[in-house]
Amino acid sequence: EKGEIVAFIGPNGAGKSTTIKMMTGILFPTEGNINILGLDPKKHRKKLAYEIGTVFGQKEQLWTHLTPYDNFKFFGAIYDIPNSVVEKKIKEFEELFELKDFINTPVRNLSLGQRIRCEIVASLIHEPKVLFLDEPTIGLDPVVKENVRSLIKRMNKEYKTTIFLTSHDVGDIEKLCKRVIIINNGQVVLDDSMENLKYHYLNKKIVEAKMKEKVNLDDEEGITILKDKGYNIKIEVDTEKRTVADALKLLNPDNIIDINISNIPLEDIISSIYKKEDQS
């Protein structure tokens, strides 16, 4: 749907990046058909380029010796956009993506987070109907990741741009997407709402703790022991049955030297989905 943010995920080698490359006309399918906005990426590659934007987190599209401002002007010229319109768009994005402090700094001198913001803006200059984001937050520190996610949400709300996102980061998916498509070996194994995925698969937390003194734990309802080496404990908490606070009480907070609480890795979530698919 227009304005939807869709997560397209799967394990390494599942075919995510290949699918995006076929959807954008970079690669062609050996069989079957692809339809993007009523266009065949193979037959209408040039026409489709005016309707879509792409950002590959590990590949640069900006000229590093130019400033972001000059890059944006360059991309505007490529898409035959009148200079006055490009200037207006640059001003809008400069404010929305908070580019003012570095818009006239050569791209090679920007931080990774700053460059990613500029990469996204460069892909939006021609106002695409669909934006493909392939690992947009890869390599970013947590604070910068959160900033980029916030900016993507604001952009989506402001311009109603449909976003097709691939990422191995649960945070990207959980905070940006309302729909999730999971593939493996080029096949769709799940297409569901983020709400349902959260309910079924993101209701567990991993708690890792370093203890002052050895503790002996037993599995209890909602708590599964993953590692128990006395001073180092790793447990899985089912938050539908027990709270993380309950788990910490079992460990005794006064006995904890260090602790880390995290989501189940996305790869594990995907694996559990595959197992359910196999069983069914």
List where the protein language model places each region.
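Conserved ABC ATPase signature
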Residues: 65, 106-110
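Conserved catalytic motifs of ABC-family nucleotide-binding domains
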Residues: 127
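Catalytic Walker B motif of ABC-type/P-loop ATPase nucleotide-binding domains
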Residues: 131-135
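ABC transporter nucleotide-binding domain
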Residues: 149-238
